Structures are given as C-alpha cells and as structure tokens.
Amino acid sequence: MRNHVLAASISMLSLLAIMGDTDSKTDSSFLMDSQRCMRHHYVDSISHPLYKCSSKMVLLARCEGHCSQASRSEPLVSFSTVLKQPFRSSCHCCRPQTSKLKALRLRCSGGMRLTATYRYILSCHCEECSS
C-alpha cells in the first residue's frame, strides 16, 4: 500500500511538472514567434569562380521569416484612358536592418591571395517591399 501512495505522489508531481511546462515551447505564441522575421545563421563554403584557390568555410547570416502585416493590391481609379499603374500594392518583407562588411583571404595557386568581401547581417526587420 505504501508503494502505491508513493507512486501516486510521483505521478501527480510529474503531471504538474508537465502541465506547468505548457507555457514554454509548446505555446502557440512561441510557434508564431519562431516564424517571425529574424536572423538565421548557416555555414557556407567560399571559393573563387575562376581561379584555383582553396575554399574556406564561413559563418553567414540571412533574414528569414514572416512579417505580421498583410500584403494587398487594390485597383486605382483614374479618369485617364491609359493606366500607367493600375494597382496600388503594399507588402512587407523580411530584410537586413544592420550589417557589417567582412572580408576573408583565399590562398590561390602560384602564391596569389585573393580577398572576398561580403555583408554579415547583424539584425533583421520587416519593411515595405520595393517594386
């Protein structure tokens, strides 16, 4: 009988621990948050397209995710027979907000060294898309 009470107490504590954890990563706000516009890191190999250089692995970042504003297009009303822009559109894109210039040197055949440059994304945000 004593073992059954202990097992029931442990089961109840486990249930409370599981129920108490529902506000963390299983919450729908977390799922929405994980899809928002944000910076994602990845590793890529950089090599020169023409010269025979040793490639280098580099940590890069990209902006990816959804913006909360809805996209839409609506017709423009005009009293002209020619409509240069028949629609007004609005949309928001996940784009880099801040970045910094980075460089790396590749060793090539014949002792030559080439410098590759790229922008490393520091932060991302939603902004109106350009046409």
Curated annotation (Swiss-Prot):
GO biological process, one term: cell population proliferation
Domain CTCK stretches: 37-130
Tissues expressed in: Expressed in the outer nuclear, inner nuclear and ganglion cell layers of the retina.
One Gene Ontology molecular-function label: cytokine activity
Membrane-crossing segments per the record: none
Disulphide linkage map: 37-94, 53-108, 63-124, 67-126
Superkingdom of the source species: Eukaryota
Residues annotated as signal peptide: 1-24
Keywords: Disulfide bond, Secreted, Signal, Wnt signaling pathway
Matches recorded under InterPro entries: Cys_knot_C, Cystine-knot_cytokine, DAN, Norrie_dis
Pfam families hit by this protein: DAN (PF03045)
Entry's localization field: Secreted
One CC-aspect GO term: cell surface
Record's subunit section: Homodimer; disulfide-linked. Component of a complex, at least composed of TSPAN12, FZD4, LRP5/6 and norrin (NDP). Binds FZD4 with high affinity. Interacts with LRP6 (via Beta-propellers 1 and 2).
Function of the protein: Activates the canonical Wnt signaling pathway through FZD4 and LRP5 coreceptor. Plays a central role in retinal vascularization by acting as a ligand for FZD4 that signals via stabilizing beta-catenin (CTNNB1) and activating LEF/TCF-mediated transcriptional programs. Acts in concert with TSPAN12 to activate FZD4 independently of the Wnt-dependent activation of FZD4, suggesting the existence of a Wnt-independent signaling that also promote accumulation the beta-catenin (CTNNB1). May be involved in a pathway that regulates neural cell differentiation and proliferation.
Name of the protein in question: Norrin
Gene source species: Mus musculus (Mouse)
Gene: Ndp
